[in-house]
């Protein structure tokens, strides 16, 4: 992995940076997918599986958030990372989905109790 404290000036470093940003997008997407899979399990009454999937979702989201924080710190407002906006969108929608799905799972648990 490249040094996220220094934003690249060369094409090779830019390609490495894009790879890191893609990792942010992938982790965010994985977090969202796991959260929706957890909701499906909760709707079927399998709350243990739902909890396990939400734990996995949280870990993927934490990884994505860590990368995002380092990228933002490294860019220092210079706008060198065009794809970062797309990556941030993935992260924020994943965070929102996870929060809402947590609430929905709790509602399903109460309804099935």
Language-model segment annotations:
Residues 2-113:
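Terminal alpha-helical segments
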